[in-house]
Amino acid sequence: MRLIDSTAKISPLAVIEDGAQIGAHVEIGPFCVIGKNVKIDAKTILHSHVVINGHTEIGEQNQIFQFASIGEINQDLKYQGEPTKVVIGDRNSIRESVTIHRGTVQGGGVTRIGNDNLFMINAHIAHDCNISNHCIIANNGTLAGHVRLDDFVIVGGMSAIHQFVIIGSHVMLGGGSMVSQDVPPYVMAQGNHAQPFGVNLEGLKRRGFDKPTMHAIRHVYKLIYRSGKTIEEVLPEIEHIALNEPAIKVYLDFFKHSTRGIIR
């Protein structure tokens, strides 16, 4: 049985399998295909030719454009058909031909997307990725499995991120970057392989960071990249700075979970 709210607008040319749950004021355009284990919450709009499969949950007020594919079987050869998920939050814009694959048991079972993100044309988000809030992946940006993007990350067009990489909050990756190691918060990076070239000051200004906070961030950047010391050697000083500067605390979580080493 399909559970479709009476206020939903669904094209007669769309295919919605029995079991799908469609919320209030959802709009589904022609030639969309919605699988039986899909849940779509209020005011989300699917333009034409969108395919949503698997155990996929989509929040409110998202816009999903034509030829996007969400919740499809992942490309991990270990996958054996387990009921893994894609979970997407609210107010995301998922543009044409974006692909978002379901998770794997080995990776926790969920590919998770937060709120207020923009995925531009032909972006790919592989199994078990965890994308936070306010991120942008530009055209043809690709994330391998298990990648983590923290808040306000921008991935430039034609960039590729290696599996298990962590990209810290407020990072700006220039177009065409190949990223195989973790990128600390607030960094601008570009290249093949990506290298750091300063703090993302313009992005921080746009998001309301004050001068003392940006000064602290620049100081930590210099500790990491210009002191000649290892992360283990500078971490105590970063911890001390974080006691009085909340914006520095994100470094502590980043280094706690970083396993691939950082870009240099």
UniProtKB/Swiss-Prot annotation:
Cited Pfam families: Acetyltransf_11 (PF13720), Hexapep (PF00132)
Keyword Lipid biosynthesis: yes
GO CC term (a single one): membrane
Keyword Lipid metabolism: yes
Function of the molecule: Involved in the biosynthesis of lipid A, a phosphorylated glycolipid that anchors the lipopolysaccharide to the outer membrane of the cell.
NCBIfam families, A to Z: lipid_A_lpxA (TIGR01852), PRK05289.1 (NF003657)
Protein name as annotated: Acyl-[acyl-carrier-protein]--UDP-N-acetylglucosamine O-acyltransferase
Organism: Haemophilus ducreyi (strain 35000HP / ATCC 700724)
